[in-house]
Amino acid sequence: MKTFSAKPHEVKREWFVVDATDKVLGRLATEIARRLRGKHKAIYTPHIDTGDFVVVTNVDKITVTGNKAEDKKYFRHSGYPGGIYETNFKKMQQRFPGRALETAVKGMLPKGPLGYAMLKKLKCYAGEQHPHTAQQPKALEI
């Protein structure tokens, strides 16, 4: 018996919608990364993108445990000498609501072209509304 390897054109992608209200950042990101990679499917193949699309609503209501709202730091650099900027989780959520979740999920996906393709299937929205109703996403409880 040969080892099964999924073909890219044989993969059936589904759409899921997740309500992130009062969900913990890391636990939510772990399940989303798992869905984006396709590890929940029997046809999972590491070198093929077998994952599904995930739409996350209410990303502005994600929480973190403990004192991480103040202590968790995000860094970015302007490209100039001394141009490093530091922002905590609380300010990041106010300014860019979806970026904390995207950063957490990005760290859990493979690095390289395959990981970038998987990350494009993540859609984050601050409110309850999203423009993907035509895809008829299934509700996913996490």
UniProtKB/Swiss-Prot annotation:
CDD domains from the UniProt entry: Ribosomal_L13 (cd00392)
Alphabetical GO biological process terms: negative regulation of translation; translation
Domain of life, per lineage: Bacteria
GO terms under cellular component: cytosolic large ribosomal subunit
Molecular-function annotations in GO: mRNA binding; structural constituent of ribosome
One Pfam short name: Ribosomal_L13
Alphabetized UniProt keyword annotations: Ribonucleoprotein, Ribosomal protein
Family statement drawn from the similarity comment of this UniProt entry: Belongs to the universal ribosomal protein uL13 family.
Database matches in PANTHER family: LARGE RIBOSOMAL SUBUNIT PROTEIN UL13M, RIBOSOMAL PROTEIN L13
NCBIfam families in the cross-refs: rplM_bact
Subunit-level organization: Part of the 50S ribosomal subunit.
Function: This protein is one of the early assembly proteins of the 50S ribosomal subunit, although it is not seen to bind rRNA by itself. It is important during the early stages of 50S assembly.
Protein name: Large ribosomal subunit protein uL13
UniProt gene name: rplM
